[in-house]
């Protein structure tokens, strides 16, 4: 579904307390038989804990929200507009927080973005796109997961349909 729910956690017990905000994505996707409505597949905070990034594979966006930590309220501040029919599925940030990796289910690729902030405005600049499979015909093939190795040196992705796992070395300077 296309909804993000923010929950307050009790500071002494860690237990879930009240709902502090709910945000609904709106819009239509381009693949009528598959991804025609908002469908949030992954949310991640930036490493500096300022912004929540929400991948929506139904409308091909990653919406960027500023989180008010005191009130638990989200405010949209940016949108990463992914390629049409790409279906952004999972997000991961590099250990140092400078790079965002987005694996797209239908496009079968990893998009690499450089992240920085200027004057309280987040910027995500696309710097590289890497295919997750060497197949040229993607019918029945879908990138399905993204992870970074414990030592931060490799991106690992899996692709359903051709049943493969791919490993990419991360250039620590350029992402």
Model-based region annotation:
Residues 141-174:
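Loop/turn-rich, solvent-exposed surfaces of beta-rich toroidal or solenoidal domains
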Residues 1-42:
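Asp-box/WD-like beta-propeller blade repeats and closely related beta-sheet repeat scaffolds
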Residues 48-50, 96-98, 151-153:
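Short coil/turn segments that connect the beta-strands within blades of beta-propeller domains
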Residues 20-35, 79, 126-138:
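Surface-exposed loop and turn segments in beta-propeller and other repeat-based domains
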Residues 1, 46, 54-57, 94, ...:
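Conserved beta-strand positions in repeat-built beta-propeller and related beta-rich domains
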Residues 6-16, 66-73, 113-123, 168-175:
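Short loop/turn segments immediately following beta-strands, especially the blade-tip
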């Amino acid at each position: 579904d296309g909804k993000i729910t923010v929950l307050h956690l009790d500071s002494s017990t860690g237990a879930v307390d009240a709902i502090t905000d709910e945000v609904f994505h709106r819009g239509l996707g381009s693949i009528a038989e598959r991804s025609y409505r908002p469908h949030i597949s992954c949310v991640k905070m930036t490493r500096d804990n300022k912004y929540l990034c929400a991948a929506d594979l139904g409308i091909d966006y990653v919406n960027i929200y500023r989180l008010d930590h005191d009130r638990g309220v989200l405010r949209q501040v940016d949108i990463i507009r992914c390629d049409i029919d790409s279906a952004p599925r999972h997000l991961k940030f590099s250990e140092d927080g400078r790079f965002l990796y987005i694996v797209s289910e239908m496009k079968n690729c990893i998009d690499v973005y450089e992240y920085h902030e200027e004057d309280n405005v987040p910027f995500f600049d696309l710097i590289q796109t890497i295919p997750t499979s060497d197949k040229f015909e993607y019918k029945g093939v879908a990138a399905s997961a993204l992870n970074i190795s414990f030592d931060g040196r490799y991106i690992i992705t899996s692709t359903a349909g051709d049943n493969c796992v791919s490993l990419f070395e991360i250039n620590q300077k350029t992402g």
